Amino acid sequence: MIQPQTYLNVADNSGARKLMCIQILGASNRKYAHIGDIIIAVVKEAIPNMPLKKSEVVRAVVVRTCKELKRKNGTIIQFDDNAAVIINQEGNPKGTRVFGPVARELRESNFTKIVSLAPEVL
């Protein structure tokens, strides 16, 4: 469950390291974002000499959450950190690599490009 003011790790090589969520896209009164949801975030920490700079506002899709996710078959999946992948306006990732595992629910949310770049899909 990601809410405004939540810090997330960046799971790609776009140049940012940490993001802070400032808004969840969808309904106007939405309080939480889960895996596969698009958020608007601000870059809080960035790698030097990269395209993304600190205090830049970006769109990102949540790929991992600490809050457990219950699937229809009864299994529960939980990650060690909150992480997101930065995307452009069309929904394609800005980076060329994705680090760490991602959830299978991203495929149902039409983020197949992120799923194909990920080293492991859980």
From Swiss-Prot:
<dbReference type="GO" id="GO:0070180">
    <property type="term" value="F:large ribosomal subunit rRNA binding"/>
</dbReference>
<dbReference type="InterPro" id="IPR000218">
    <property type="entry name" value="Ribosomal_uL14"/>
</dbReference>
<keyword id="KW-0934">Plastid</keyword>
<keyword id="KW-0699">rRNA-binding</keyword>
<dbReference type="InterPro" id="IPR019972">
    <property type="entry name" value="Ribosomal_uL14_CS"/>
</dbReference>
<protein>
    <recommendedName>
        <fullName>Large ribosomal subunit protein uL14c</fullName>
    </recommendedName>
</protein>
<keyword id="KW-0687">Ribonucleoprotein</keyword>
<dbReference type="GO" id="GO:0006412">
    <property type="term" value="P:translation"/>
</dbReference>
<dbReference type="GO" id="GO:0022625">
    <property type="term" value="C:cytosolic large ribosomal subunit"/>
</dbReference>
<comment type="similarity">
    <text>Belongs to the universal ribosomal protein uL14 family.</text>
</comment>
<comment type="function">
    <text>Binds to 23S rRNA.</text>
</comment>
<dbReference type="GO" id="GO:0009507">
    <property type="term" value="C:chloroplast"/>
</dbReference>
<dbReference type="Pfam" id="PF00238">
    <property type="entry name" value="Ribosomal_L14"/>
</dbReference>
<keyword id="KW-0150">Chloroplast</keyword>
<keyword id="KW-0694">RNA-binding</keyword>
<comment type="subunit">
    <text>Part of the 50S ribosomal subunit.</text>
</comment>
<keyword id="KW-0689">Ribosomal protein</keyword>
<dbReference type="GO" id="GO:0003735">
    <property type="term" value="F:structural constituent of ribosome"/>
</dbReference>
<dbReference type="InterPro" id="IPR036853">
    <property type="entry name" value="Ribosomal_uL14_sf"/>
</dbReference>
<dbReference type="InterPro" id="IPR005745">
    <property type="entry name" value="Ribosomal_uL14_bac-type"/>
</dbReference>
